[in-house]
Amino acid sequence: MSEASIAKKAELVDAVAEKMKAAVSIVVVDSRGLTVEQDTVLRRNLRESAVEFKVIKNSILRRAAEKAGLEGFDDIFTGPSAVAFSNEDVVAPAKIINDFAKDAEALEIKGGAIEGAVSTKEEIQALAALPNREGLLSMLLSVLQAPVRNVAYAVKAVAESKDEDAA
């Protein structure tokens, strides 16, 4: 192998390691058997949620994971691998890929990492079942509003009953 080729691969390892360090969520999949159309739709869905999706050689992924300080990926980096990196939403890549895998049987989740901790296929699928950040915030807001709403209804009912008594 030429020195230029080795230097390019070293740069690629460094770039992937930086992506792994910066990512809050990483999902590794085997996308063998996806049609071009399915792959295009999957990539579009991921891009809309600010998730980067790349097909990367396992040897580069192993070296990058080692450089990023992530251990336990050896079982995950077997066979063809595509990786989804998210720097913002922990749930987005898992949810999009899991939902897509229900329709496209060729797509198989292998595992990943959540906030720097290596995760199994089952943990990624469990993460996918959670609502996204906006959904969780709206649930929290509705829980916080419920007592205030109940007090408002009680005050309104008391006011209406006093109006009826006065009339």
Curated annotation (Swiss-Prot):
Protein name listed in UniProt: Large ribosomal subunit protein uL10
Highest taxon listed in the record's lineage: Bacteria
SUPFAM superfamilies the UniProt entry points to: Ribosomal protein L10-like
Keywords associated with the record: Ribonucleoprotein, Ribosomal protein, RNA-binding, rRNA-binding
CDD domains cross-referenced by the UniProt entry: Ribosomal_L10 (cd05797)
One record GO biological process: translation
Gene Ontology CC: large ribosomal subunit
Subunit structure: Part of the ribosomal stalk of the 50S ribosomal subunit. The N-terminus interacts with L11 and the large rRNA to form the base of the stalk. The C-terminus forms an elongated spine to which L12 dimers bind in a sequential fashion forming a multimeric L10(L12)X complex.
Gene Ontology MF: a single term: structural constituent of ribosome
InterPro entries: Ribosomal_uL10 (IPR001790), Ribosomal_uL10-like_sf (IPR043141), Ribosomal_uL10_bac (IPR022973), Ribosomal_uL10_bac_type (IPR047865), Ribosomal_uL10_CS_bac (IPR002363)
General function of this protein: Forms part of the ribosomal stalk, playing a central role in the interaction of the ribosome with GTP-bound translation factors.
Family (UniProt): Belongs to the universal ribosomal protein uL10 family.
Gene3D superfamilies attached to this UniProt entry: 3.30.70.1730
Annotated organism of origin: Streptococcus mutans serotype c (strain ATCC 700610 / UA159)
Lineage: Bacteria, Bacillati, Bacillota, Bacilli, Lactobacillales
